[in-house]
Amino acid sequence: MRILLTNDDGINSKGIILLAEYLSKEHEVFVVAPDKERSATGHSITIHVPLWMKKVFISEDVVAYSTTGTPADCVKLGYNVIMEKRVDLVVSGINRGPNMGMDILYSGTVSGAMEGAMMNIPSIAISSASYESPDFEGAARFLISFLKEFDLSLLDPFTMLNINVPVGEIKGWKLTRQSRRRWNDYFEERISPFGEKYYWMMGEVIEDDDREDVDYRVVQQGYVSVTPIHPFLTNEGCLRKLREVYESCTE
């Protein structure tokens, strides 16, 4: 396959370099990744300033570029400019830390893959589910075996897979739902060396989803979480309920 690889941790991160090395053994790999850390940039794109791109070396078998853009920018550039719209798979990662629950709305990693899905290209975001001790090697090995096993043609149009890999022994993988995992934010007030006040965002994770088949619960049990997601955010159940009440009011 012709694979477009990106991330949000930057072109020099261990996760993307290792994944490029593994994937290039069996596939034609093109890397287009940010030139610096772009975590939590969500699905932002660059429209008011130029995008710069520079060819870099990762290995003899990989074509690689760094850009001044976001992960979504990288996929747009890779698809339209570098790979001339001939892409079989978009992979974003390997992220340092999990992308589960409401994380996915902030995640540059997920947004890189979602950009591919919005082009109707099979796309995967992959994360090692530990920020402190990520296992990039284990996540890379899992993805290689998963690609041999999983039939990407079964994905609905405009749908991607969000994969979170536990650290340590992997018992297998399970199809999951996005959880309601979220953060309770608070801000620490600090004083700069110039005597000016600034704020540093902190947070405590909330994991109170009692459903068994959600992403973080499966990862906590030692399984890889594989969640199909798409960019269409309409709450269909709520829409039906509201129409029952208000449809007559709008006629």
From Swiss-Prot:
Binds 1 divalent metal cation per subunit. It catalyses: a ribonucleoside 5'-phosphate + H2O = a ribonucleoside + phosphate. InterPro entries: SurE (IPR030048), SurE-like_Pase/nucleotidase (IPR002828), SurE-like_sf (IPR036523). It is found in: Cytoplasm. A divalent metal cation binds at residues 8-9, 39, 95. Its main location: cytoplasm. Signal peptide: none annotated. Keywords: Cytoplasm, Hydrolase, Metal-binding, Nucleotide-binding. It is an enzyme of class 3 (hydrolase). Its EC number is 3.1.3.5. Its cofactor is a divalent metal cation. GO terms for cellular component: cytoplasm. Belongs to the SurE nucleotidase family. Nucleotidase that shows phosphatase activity on nucleoside 5'-monophosphates. This is 5'-nucleotidase SurE. It comes from Thermotoga neapolitana (strain ATCC 49049 / DSM 4359 / NBRC 107923 / NS-E).
